[in-house]
Amino acid sequence: FSDVNGYKFSQDCITNDLIGKMIIYGKNGSGKTNLSKALCDLKETLTMSNDMKSNHSFISNANSNNEITTFTYTFLFNNKKDKVVYEYQKTDLFNLTNEVLNINGKIIYSYDFNKNRFIEKSEDYFHNSDIFSIYQKNTNPSLPFVRWLVNNGAVEKSSVFNKMYEYAVKITQIFTPTTALIQLSRNELDELDRNVNDLEDFLNYMGIECKLSMEKLPDGSKELYFVFKNRKVAFLENASSGTLSLFNFYIRFLMPHKESSILYFDEFDAFFHFELSEKIIQYIKEKYKDSLVIFTTHNTNLMSNKIMRPDTLFILSTSGKLTPLCKATDRELREGHNLGKLYMNGEFDED
């Protein structure tokens, strides 16, 4: 994310001098979905959210001889004054073996879960010097120290511990949208009622000119309507299939995740025309300016300097190598190049 080139176009893909919006291409089976699980494992570990809902417990590459997998995340907080490196090791989705937190080059703690003891520890950032022994006596065998600190109020709200935890909570994985219409609960209908103007703006942005309203029915339930000059008509019964696909996309993904730190859209445009996919990217770039947003797709029409740039377009090889287009060729890529055409002609190294 820090490997930013000096392109002067599509600056909205860059956030705080980091790549903030990217598209990843790769053959089926290259690992795009697994990449999302690896990147977003921080949320699973710190919040125990089980968002991945995996049906297996292993997390290492199936070809690897290592039983332990290491995850390392680097953050810059407080206007980049504090560099936080958080590292942990796991044998499977649920069991930690080691956890290390480093702030500005100093190890604050290193914990061995197998031995149930701190290998290294520093009292910096903690008001209570007994915090380490309290944790050891009261924790379960695989509860991250960071999570325990935050949930027990052992650190200040403004601390890097809380900031890292809040970042993890807001990580969102979004898998291939479905064309099946979802049934909304009463709470979701209430949420839609509060966001009906935002939904209307979204559809208008996508080129569907309409006015919407939520109406209360005699039985107390709510229903979404198109508003025309002389009457209102039920939205779900009269919207086109394309409009319903966008409605589903908004309801399932955009409405509940307005403040995401990371948004990983896997095969986000599987059911959308490429022009609509382009509009969705533009919309999300505008609405999620401070978020890290990653799209995966097979749509080479989106491989364009019009909406992206060569350092934000990536190829994931079957060997697991992630390479930006600007480093996948010896050619100096310029704004006027047709990147999609170059890709189809075999310009970029995919090994």
Give, region by region, the residue ranges found by the protein language model.
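Post-Walker A helix-loop "phosphate-sensing" segment adjacent to the P-loop in P-loop NTPases
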Residues: 41-53, 257-258, 287-289
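Short alpha-helix of the ABC ATPase nucleotide-binding domain corresponding to the H-loop/switch region
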Residues: 273-278
